[in-house]
């Protein structure tokens, strides 16, 4: 029996239902889900995480869809992908990475891997599906 390994990645600063949705969709793309949690110093496209690196890994690892969680490499985001050798890389619907750019980088490294994008989760009326929005709400309500 062939096992399909899937990689998901992200910051996962303050966990919310959007993260769970992404990880469930990623898990459905294969048999084993490996999650690479971005190191704080590598998060440059948005505000740095509030929650420490190891704590974010521990929280992600505790989620049902996740089989393995690890901290990303300090200098090269593709090192863990080379170690895992996944069949699929699952991108979140709102992640800033472009599928074509990831595919090109994988080809350059000799990695044969499908790149797919998970779909969005529609928020219910009272749901907050963004870490930034959660932080803003906390600041508004606790000030």
Swiss-Prot record:
Keyword terms, alphabetized: ATP-binding, FAD, Flavoprotein, FMN, Nucleotide-binding, Nucleotidyltransferase, Transferase
One Pfam family of this chain: CTP_transf_like
GO terms of biological process kind: FAD biosynthetic process; FMN metabolic process
Xref: InterPro entries: Archaeal_FAD_synthase, Cyt_trans-like, FAD_synth_RibL, Rossmann-like_a/b/a_fold
EC category: transferase
Family: Belongs to the archaeal FAD synthase family.
HAMAP family associated with the record: FAD_synth_arch
The protein's name in its UniProt record: FAD synthase
Lineage of origin: Archaea, Methanobacteriati, Methanobacteriota, Stenosarchaea group, Halobacteria
